[in-house]
């Protein structure tokens, strides 16, 4: 791991802009260009939004976000203590189905999967949810 930036923040909708700026600044500092930075910021925003809205469901809580670089990969790790939910278990939406026939939701996870190269989830022994987003292609 080359460098790492960490943000601890209350899991509130009002803080999503702070999270986006933090990920953007961290990615840029770690050498990511505009395209990679944009993809990672949007994926992290979708992940954080899911934690706030679906994980904590309006209850107080925090999110810890770590942005690091390993070789040519930018890694964003989100940790929380919200209700466990594995976004990698959600099947992709049927994009051929008319909008009015689709179940609501699921597009954020779909976007996340397509914006980054890897999305992994696990629960730590301490009971934290850990979602890791990996985007490759940073210049050496």
Which residue stretches match the model-derived regions?
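STAS-typified acidic loop motif
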Residues: 6-18
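N-terminal hydrophobic alpha-helix used for membrane targeting or insertion
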Residues: 9-10, 34, 69
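Conserved beta-strand-loop-beta-strand hairpin that lines the nucleotide-binding pocket
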Residues: 1-6, 52-140
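Conserved short strand/loop->alpha-helix "switch" segment adjacent to the catalytic nucleotide/phosphoryl-transfer site
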Residues: 17, 23-45, 49, 101-103
């Amino acid at each position: 791991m080359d460098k790492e930036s960490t943000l601890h923040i209350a899991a509130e909708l009002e803080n999503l802009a702070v999270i986006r700026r933090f990920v953007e600044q961290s990615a840029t500092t770690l050498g990511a260009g505009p395209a990679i930075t944009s993809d990672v910021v949007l994926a992290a925003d979708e992940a954080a939004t899911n934690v706030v809205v679906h994980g904590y469901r309006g209850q107080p809580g925090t999110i810890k976000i770590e942005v690091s670089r390993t070789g040519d990969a930018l890694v964003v790790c989100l940790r929380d203590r919200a209700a466990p939910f594995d976004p990698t278990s959600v099947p992709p939406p049927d994009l051929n189905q008319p909008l009015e026939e689709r179940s609501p939701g699921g597009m954020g996870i779909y976007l996340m999967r397509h914006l980054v190269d890897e999305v992994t989830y696990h629960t730590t022994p301490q009971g934290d949810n850990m979602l890791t987003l990996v985007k490759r292609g940073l210049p050496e």
